Amino acid sequence: MKRRRLFFSVLLSILTLFINGPLITTAQSPPSSSTSCNRICGGIEIPFPFGIGRRDCFLNDWYEVVCNSTTSGKSLAPFLYKINRELVSITLRSSIDSSYGVVHIKSPVTSSGCSQRPVKPLPLNLTGKGSPFFITDSNRLVSVGCDNRALITDIESQITGCESSCDGDKSRLDKICGGYTCCQAKIPADRPQVIGVDLESSGGNTTQGGNCKVAFLTNETYSPANVTEPEQFYTNGFTVIELGWYFDTSDSRLTNPVGCVNLTETGIYTSAPSCVCEYGNFSGFGYSNCYCNQIGYRGNPYLPGGCIDIDECEEGKGLSSCGELTCVNVPGSWRCELNGVGKIKPLFPGLVLGFPLLFLVLGIWGLIKFVKKRRKIIRKRMFFKRNGGLLLKQQLTTRGGNVQSSKIFSSKELEKATDNFNMNRVLGQGGQGTVYKGMLVDGRIVAVKRSKVLDEDKVEEFINEVGVLSQINHRNIVKLMGCCLETEVPILVYEHIPNGDLFKRLHHDSDDYTMTWDVRLRISVEIAGALAYLHSAASTPVYHRDVKTTNILLDEKYRAKVSDFGTSRSINVDQTHLTTLVAGTFGYLDPEYFQTSQFTDKSDVYSFGVVLVELITGEKPFSVMRPEENRGLVSHFNEAMKQNRVLDIVDSRIKEGCTLEQVLAVAKLARRCLSLKGKKRPNMREVSVELERIRSSPEDLELHIEEEDEEECAMEINMDDSWSVDMTAPASLFDLSPKLDVEPLVPQRTW
C-alpha cells in the first residue's frame, strides 16, 4: 500500500512538473504608496486607495480620510472627508464573487417624540464628479415605535416606506419586523446616490403622536426579538450602513490603474497572474474593481506589487497534498518534487514515463470532461426549477396560453445572438435588468432581456410577465417570442422595436422631428386600442398597472407598441378590482388607487389620461421648471382647463399643423380620464371609440363633448405635498433624458 501511494505521488509530481514548467520561486514584497503614511486611526485599518495625511497617501479627495476626535473627545475616529461620515470599516474587494469594495459608515437616527424637538438629519449625498460611492441593496429602512410611517426620500421617482403599530395581532412578532412595533423595507435596487429618511405618524402629522419613534437606514438585520425600545436607538444616535465603492475609469489618473495596467473595456483581464481587474458600467459611467488572484495571492491590488505570493508549503496546504514528496513553492501555487532522483529508478522504471502516464492523463481528462458535462446538465435543471419553470408550465396550462407561440431558447442560442451579451449591444438598463439587441439564426432581430442576479422574491414577478405576455396577441402590444430558464438569471426574448420609446420622441429635440399632431393622435388611438384589448378582449382580462410614455415603444413606422408587463396582473372575469402593494410611477399614479390600494381598470384609464396630456402639451409629468403648485403636469393641465386657456399649453411644435377642434376634444377626453373618482371615468373601450371618432370625424366633435363638473377636477400624487420627497437628483422622467429602457420604474410602498 505504501509503495502504491508513492507511485501515484510520483505520477502526480511528473504531471505537475509538465504543466507548471520551470517557475521562479521568489516572492516580492509590495511597496507602500508612501512609507510614512499613517494607516491606522482609532484602531481601524485604512488601506490604499484610502489614506490619511498627505495627498500621496490616498488616490484622490473621495478617498481622503481625516482622523478627528469623536464627539466625546476621548478618542480618535476616521471620517470620510468628502461626505463627512464616520468610518466603521473599509474592505477591499476580495474575490470574483463580489463586484465592488465595501465601506461601512455611521448613519444618524431620525426621531420624533423622543425629545422636545424632532431630529431629522440631512440626507446622505454621494453625488459629485468622480464619486466612487453608492448605497448597496443590502441596506434596509427600519422603523421602531408605535403608529409610525417611515419613508425613504431623495430616490427620484420612487416611493418606498413602511408602517409599524402597536395594535393588532401579536402573532406578527414571529416575523422579521413585519409591522408590529417595528417594520422594514428594502431600498431600491438601482444603487441610489442620494438618500434620506422621513418620519411621521400614521395620521400624517409629523409633530404629534406623543410617543418616541425612530427610523434609520442600516445593513443589520432586526426582528422583534432583538429590537429594543426606540429610546435606546435615539440614545445611541446612529446605526451602521454599507456603501459600495469602485474606480471611475473616466478619471485620467486611472487610465492605467495603480495595481493593474492597461485597463480595457473588454471584460476581465490580468496584468499579471497575481492581479485581476474587472470592468463594469454604473449609471452610464465606466468603473473597475481589482482583487488579488484567489489562487495563491493575497494583499492590496491597488499598490504596485501589492498582491503577495502565499507560501502554501509553509501554510501546510502543499505539504498535505505532496505526501512523501517535497513541497516546493512557486508563484501563485506549489509543486511536489522527488526527494532524490535515485528513488524513482527501482519503482517501475519503464512505466513511470511511458504509456501509463499517457493513459492516466487521458483518463483524468475524460473524467473531468464527463463530470463537467454532468454538472452542466444538473445546473441547467436546477436553474430551470429555481427560475420558476414549473410555475410557468402550470400558468401556461391554467391560462390556456399559446405554448407554441413562445419558444424555449437555449442559453447557447442567446449567447450567439447577442455576441455573448456584448456591452456594445446594450439597448437599455433598468432596475430589473439589462436589454440587449440580438439576431437569431433565422435573421430575426430581437430584444433579449436579461434579469439581474436572481432574487427569489422576484421569481413570481418574472413568471407573471411571461404568463401575461404568452396569452396576448395584438398588433400594438410588444410580442413575447420566448424565454430561457436554464441560465443562472432568467432571460426573456421580445420582438425588437427599433425607434425607442415615446417619452424620448416627445421630449428630446431633433432635426428629424416626426411627432406631428396627426402622428400623436394616431399613437393615442393605438395605445387606447391596446389597453382596451387588455381590459376586455384578451382571453383573461389584464391590468397593465404602469402605463406611461417610457413604456410605449415605436416601431419603424412609428406605430405604438405597449410594453413592460413587470407589474401587470391578470384577473378573473367577475372581479372588479385588485388589492395590491402600491406600484406605479409619480405623475401617472391614480390617486384613488394610491389611497385605497385597490387597482381597477379605471386606474389604467387615469394613467392613459396623463399620456394624452403629454401628447397635447409636450411637457414632462413632473418639472421643477413650472411653478411649485403646478409642478405636476396634471395640476398644470387642470388649471389651464379651468381658465379656458388650453391652447396656451399646447406644444408649440404642433400648433401650426394641428386641428384645434381635435386638440380641444382630446383635452376634454383627457380631463374625463383624469377624474378624481374612478366611476366618473370612461372605460378604455369608450376611450378608444371616442378617439377613433375624433380622428375620423373632426368636423362633428362638439355634439359628443360633455362638460365635467368643476368638483370632479383631476388631482395627482404630488411628491412634495404627499410624501415630502426632496428632489435633489432628478430622474430622467422629470428633467433629464431617459435611458432607452423597456424596464418598468416600479416604486413600491411596503406596509
Swiss-Prot record:
Q: What is its EC number?
A: 2.7.11.-
Keyword Phosphoprotein assigned to the entry: answer is: yes
Task: Provide the protein's localization.
Answer: Membrane
Ranges of the Extracellular topological domain: 28-347
Transmembrane stretches, start-end: 348-368
Q: What are the boundaries of the region Atypical EGF-like?
A: 275-336
The SS bond pairs are: C277-C290, C313-C327, C322-C336
Residues in coiled coil: none
Location of the active site:
D546 (proton acceptor)
- Carbohydrate attachment sites? N68, N125, N205, N219, N226, N262, N281
Please indicate the ranges of residues that lie on the Cytoplasmic side. Answer: 369-751
Q: Which GO terms describe its biological process?
A: cell surface receptor signaling pathway; response to fungus
Binding-site residues for ATP, renumbered to this chain: L427, G428, Q429, G430, G431, Q432, G433, T434, V435, K449
Q: What is known of its domains?
A: The EGF-like region is specific to this family of proteins and seems to consist of the C-terminal of an EGF-like domain fused to the N-terminal of another one.
Similarity comment: family membership:
Belongs to the protein kinase superfamily. Ser/Thr protein kinase family.
Q: What does this protein do?
A: Serine/threonine-protein kinase that may function as a signaling receptor of extracellular matrix component. Required during plant's response to pathogen infection.
Q: Return the protein name.
A: Wall-associated receptor kinase-like 22
Organism, by scientific name, is Arabidopsis thaliana
Which gene codes for it? WAKL22
